[in-house]
Amino acid sequence: MPSELTPEERSELKNSIAEFHTYQLDPGSCSSLHAQRIHAPPELVWSIVRRFDKPQTYKHFIKSCSVEQNFEMRVGCTRDVIVISGLPANTSTERLDILDDERRVTGFSIIGGEHRLTNYKSVTTVHRFEKENRIWTVVLESYVVDMPEGNSEDDTRCFADTVVKLNLQKLATVAEAMARNSGDGSGSQVT
Protein backbone atom coordinates (compact mmCIF):
# COMPACT_ATOMS: atom_id res chain seq x y z
CA MET A 1 0.00 0.00 0.00
CA PRO A 2 1.55 3.35 -1.01
CA SER A 3 2.80 5.34 1.98
CA GLU A 4 1.61 8.62 0.40
CA LEU A 5 -2.00 7.76 1.26
CA THR A 6 -3.80 8.88 4.40
CA PRO A 7 -5.43 6.20 6.59
CA GLU A 8 -8.85 7.27 5.26
CA GLU A 9 -7.69 7.00 1.65
CA ARG A 10 -6.11 3.61 2.31
CA SER A 11 -9.32 2.32 3.83
CA GLU A 12 -11.46 3.55 0.95
CA LEU A 13 -9.05 2.24 -1.74
CA LYS A 14 -8.50 -1.20 -0.21
CA ASN A 15 -11.09 -2.97 -2.42
CA SER A 16 -9.89 -1.29 -5.61
CA ILE A 17 -6.31 -2.25 -4.83
CA ALA A 18 -7.36 -5.86 -4.27
CA GLU A 19 -9.40 -5.96 -7.49
CA PHE A 20 -7.18 -4.07 -9.94
CA HIS A 21 -3.69 -3.68 -8.49
CA THR A 22 -2.79 -7.10 -7.06
CA TYR A 23 -0.83 -9.53 -9.24
CA GLN A 24 0.09 -13.20 -9.16
CA LEU A 25 3.83 -12.99 -9.81
CA ASP A 26 5.61 -15.54 -11.94
CA PRO A 27 9.25 -16.30 -11.12
CA GLY A 28 11.39 -13.59 -12.67
CA SER A 29 8.73 -10.88 -12.56
CA CYS A 30 8.04 -7.99 -10.21
CA SER A 31 5.29 -5.46 -9.57
CA SER A 32 4.71 -2.17 -7.84
CA LEU A 33 1.87 0.20 -6.91
CA HIS A 34 2.02 4.00 -6.79
CA ALA A 35 -0.41 6.69 -5.69
CA GLN A 36 -0.71 10.35 -6.60
CA ARG A 37 -3.02 12.83 -4.89
CA ILE A 38 -4.29 15.46 -7.33
CA HIS A 39 -6.12 18.66 -6.37
CA ALA A 40 -8.54 18.50 -9.28
CA PRO A 41 -11.90 16.82 -9.86
CA PRO A 42 -11.75 13.15 -10.84
CA GLU A 43 -13.76 13.81 -14.01
CA LEU A 44 -11.01 16.10 -15.26
CA VAL A 45 -8.22 13.70 -14.26
CA TRP A 46 -10.04 10.82 -15.94
CA SER A 47 -10.44 12.84 -19.15
CA ILE A 48 -6.63 12.91 -19.36
CA VAL A 49 -5.86 9.36 -18.22
CA ARG A 50 -8.44 7.66 -20.45
CA ARG A 51 -6.92 9.05 -23.67
CA PHE A 52 -5.02 5.97 -24.80
CA ASP A 53 -4.26 7.80 -28.05
CA LYS A 54 -2.61 10.78 -26.28
CA PRO A 55 -0.31 9.44 -23.54
CA GLN A 56 2.19 12.23 -24.22
CA THR A 57 -0.25 14.63 -22.52
CA TYR A 58 1.15 13.49 -19.18
CA LYS A 59 3.84 10.89 -19.83
CA HIS A 60 7.32 12.39 -19.77
CA PHE A 61 9.32 10.04 -21.93
CA ILE A 62 7.09 9.83 -25.00
CA LYS A 63 8.30 11.68 -28.07
CA SER A 64 5.25 10.79 -30.16
CA CYS A 65 2.31 8.43 -30.33
CA SER A 66 0.51 7.23 -33.44
CA VAL A 67 -2.67 5.24 -33.91
CA GLU A 68 -4.42 3.86 -36.99
CA GLN A 69 -6.18 6.35 -39.25
CA ASN A 70 -9.67 5.15 -38.29
CA PHE A 71 -8.75 4.77 -34.61
CA GLU A 72 -11.57 3.79 -32.29
CA MET A 73 -10.74 3.79 -28.59
CA ARG A 74 -11.85 0.36 -27.41
CA VAL A 75 -10.33 -2.66 -25.72
CA GLY A 76 -7.88 -4.33 -28.10
CA CYS A 77 -6.85 -1.18 -29.99
CA THR A 78 -3.13 -0.41 -30.23
CA ARG A 79 -0.80 2.56 -30.25
CA ASP A 80 2.80 2.93 -31.41
CA VAL A 81 4.96 5.04 -29.14
CA ILE A 82 8.36 6.54 -29.89
CA VAL A 83 10.38 7.06 -26.72
CA ILE A 84 12.73 10.01 -26.19
CA SER A 85 16.43 9.27 -26.55
CA GLY A 86 18.48 8.44 -23.49
CA LEU A 87 16.25 5.61 -22.27
CA PRO A 88 16.90 1.89 -22.79
CA ALA A 89 14.07 1.84 -25.34
CA ASN A 90 13.25 3.21 -28.79
CA THR A 91 9.71 2.17 -29.60
CA SER A 92 6.81 0.46 -27.92
CA THR A 93 3.63 -1.08 -29.31
CA GLU A 94 0.91 -1.08 -26.68
CA ARG A 95 -2.56 -2.64 -26.49
CA LEU A 96 -5.50 -1.24 -24.51
CA ASP A 97 -6.61 -4.02 -22.14
CA ILE A 98 -9.33 -2.26 -20.14
CA LEU A 99 -11.27 1.00 -20.42
CA ASP A 100 -14.12 1.36 -17.94
CA ASP A 101 -15.45 4.93 -17.94
CA GLU A 102 -17.98 4.23 -15.21
CA ARG A 103 -15.42 2.91 -12.72
CA ARG A 104 -12.54 5.00 -14.15
CA VAL A 105 -10.20 2.08 -14.81
CA THR A 106 -7.79 1.72 -17.70
CA GLY A 107 -4.88 -0.55 -18.44
CA PHE A 108 -2.51 -1.55 -21.20
CA SER A 109 0.11 -4.14 -22.12
CA ILE A 110 3.31 -3.67 -24.08
CA ILE A 111 3.09 -6.16 -26.95
CA GLY A 112 6.06 -5.18 -29.12
CA GLY A 113 8.76 -2.68 -29.93
CA GLU A 114 12.40 -2.08 -29.09
CA HIS A 115 12.65 -1.95 -25.29
CA ARG A 116 13.52 -4.06 -22.25
CA LEU A 117 10.09 -4.21 -20.59
CA THR A 118 8.98 -7.74 -21.45
CA ASN A 119 5.42 -8.66 -20.45
CA TYR A 120 4.77 -5.18 -19.02
CA LYS A 121 1.16 -4.68 -17.96
CA SER A 122 -0.18 -1.59 -16.22
CA VAL A 123 -3.49 -0.64 -14.60
CA THR A 124 -4.53 2.89 -13.62
CA THR A 125 -7.56 3.78 -11.51
CA VAL A 126 -8.93 7.25 -10.71
CA HIS A 127 -10.73 7.81 -7.38
CA ARG A 128 -12.84 10.66 -6.03
CA PHE A 129 -12.47 11.93 -2.45
CA GLU A 130 -14.47 14.61 -0.69
CA LYS A 131 -14.08 16.08 2.79
CA GLU A 132 -15.27 19.39 4.23
CA ASN A 133 -16.49 20.60 0.82
CA ARG A 134 -13.11 19.83 -0.79
CA ILE A 135 -12.89 17.44 -3.72
CA TRP A 136 -9.65 15.78 -4.78
CA THR A 137 -8.53 12.75 -6.73
CA VAL A 138 -6.22 9.87 -5.94
CA VAL A 139 -4.76 8.04 -8.92
CA LEU A 140 -3.38 4.55 -8.42
CA GLU A 141 -1.06 3.02 -11.01
CA SER A 142 0.38 -0.46 -10.77
CA TYR A 143 2.42 -2.62 -13.08
CA VAL A 144 3.86 -6.08 -13.44
CA VAL A 145 6.90 -6.78 -15.63
CA ASP A 146 9.49 -9.46 -16.27
CA MET A 147 12.98 -8.70 -14.99
CA PRO A 148 15.41 -8.40 -17.92
CA GLU A 149 18.22 -10.95 -17.91
CA GLY A 150 21.15 -9.59 -15.92
CA ASN A 151 18.98 -7.17 -13.94
CA SER A 152 17.92 -7.63 -10.35
CA GLU A 153 14.41 -7.05 -9.05
CA ASP A 154 15.65 -3.82 -7.46
CA ASP A 155 17.16 -2.61 -10.77
CA THR A 156 13.96 -3.37 -12.68
CA ARG A 157 11.67 -1.85 -10.09
CA CYS A 158 13.88 1.24 -9.69
CA PHE A 159 13.67 2.01 -13.42
CA ALA A 160 9.94 1.31 -13.81
CA ASP A 161 9.06 3.07 -10.52
CA THR A 162 10.93 6.20 -11.59
CA VAL A 163 9.06 6.39 -14.89
CA VAL A 164 5.65 5.79 -13.24
CA LYS A 165 6.28 8.32 -10.45
CA LEU A 166 7.41 11.03 -12.88
CA ASN A 167 4.37 10.39 -15.09
CA LEU A 168 2.00 10.63 -12.12
CA GLN A 169 3.65 13.87 -10.98
CA LYS A 170 3.24 15.34 -14.46
CA LEU A 171 -0.40 14.18 -14.50
CA ALA A 172 -0.96 16.10 -11.26
CA THR A 173 0.70 19.22 -12.68
CA VAL A 174 -1.33 19.10 -15.91
CA ALA A 175 -4.68 18.37 -14.20
CA GLU A 176 -4.20 20.96 -11.46
CA ALA A 177 -3.30 23.62 -14.04
CA MET A 178 -6.39 22.74 -16.08
CA ALA A 179 -8.56 22.97 -12.94
CA ARG A 180 -7.09 26.38 -12.01
CA ASN A 181 -7.48 27.72 -15.55
CA SER A 182 -11.12 26.69 -15.77
CA GLY A 183 -12.04 29.28 -13.13
CA ASP A 184 -14.88 27.29 -11.63
CA GLY A 185 -12.75 24.55 -10.13
CA SER A 186 -14.45 21.87 -12.19
CA GLY A 187 -11.75 21.98 -14.85
CA SER A 188 -12.03 21.54 -18.56
CA GLN A 189 -11.57 18.12 -20.04
CA VAL A 190 -9.21 16.76 -22.66
CA THR A 191 -10.97 16.10 -25.96
Residue ranges and their predicted role:
Residues 45, 79, 96, 126, ...:
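Structural signal for hydrophobic/aromatic residues that build the beta-strand cores
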Residues 1-74:
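Hydrophobic ligand-binding cavity/cleft-lining segments
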Residues 29-37, 78, 91, 105, ...:
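Intrinsic-disorder/low-complexity, polar/charged segments enriched in Ser/Thr/Lys/Arg/Asp/Glu/Gln
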Residues 50-118:
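Glycine-rich portal/gate segments that line the openings of hydrophobic small-molecule binding cavities
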Residues 109-166:
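Beta-strand/loop substructures that line and gate deep hydrophobic ligand-binding cavities in soluble
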Residues 42-43, 70-73, 98-104, 126-138:
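A short, structured loop/turn motif at beta-sheet edges
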Residues 37-41, 82-84, 99, 111, ...:
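Solvent-exposed residues in well-ordered beta-strands and their adjoining turns
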Residues 17, 169-191:
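Short, highly charged C-terminal tails/helix-capping segments
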